Amino acid sequence: MNKVIITVVGKDTVGIIEKVCTYLAENKINILDISQTIVSGYFNMMMITDMENASVDFEKTVEDLDALGDGIGVKIKAQKEEIFESMHRL
């Protein structure tokens, strides 16, 4: 498995989940787990994905998701699981 953690944060608007999930599906990136909340009008989502069978590489995914986030007014960050874990270890 090639796990990648994707986080999405920003002002809540219609279609955020749809746009992110459409990108992932079109590029054969599997969603393993997802958590999403809205707090005082701010959207927060974390996804654990598997890029094992993806049709794009990790670097392209990072660039594409960054551009997608800019287009819909949110910040989207993709990190390999081992980097995410080392940055968020308590």
Predicted regions and their residues:
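A conserved regulatory-domain signal marking ACT and ACT-like small-molecule sensing domains
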Residues: 1-90
